[in-house]
Amino acid sequence: YQGIIVAEPTNNLAVTCPRVIASGSIRFHGTSGHSSENSALKNSAIHKQARWSFNALETARKYENKKYESLEGLAFNIGSVSGGIKPNIIAQSAETKFGFRPLPGQDPFEIFTELNAKSVKGQFDFTTGFIAPSLPAKNNSHRLKALAGKLKLELSKPVNFWTEAALFNEAGYDAIVFGP
């Protein structure tokens, strides 16, 4: 065996450098009440969620000019937002699920910390979801490029998607991504 090939559509180019992938969820706590009370601005879990979402998008924008070869910025998405019961009840809880794809070499845990920095402790519960390294996971890109060369495969530029090849590489196996 010379290495591992993970099959993904790559236009017949060998991918040796996709992004990191990370996801998380954050549950916001509020104090229920009737919306006729002026406490809704402060107590609504949905309002806390909205402030977090705004700050998270601003955090992602700060990375717009960061580059790794042909990759740019932090790919960030708020994928699911839920909470509340109805318009005249102050929301006691709300939840946001989000994902992001840092550039290779960026630490997803630092970004999690930055995303949650402006949230008030005790008013939310944060849970990390799926987190996986970039490829190459162990700074061994020369070995991955050599594997592609041995197989006479043309190299791809770094790509935005993530694949399981990074997990094989993190476990010590040379792994590339290749497919039609």
Feature-to-residue mapping (PLM):
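A glycine-rich helix N-cap at a beta->alpha junction
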Residues: Y1-N11
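Metal-dependent amide/peptide-bond hydrolase catalytic core
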Residues: P9, T16, A22-P180
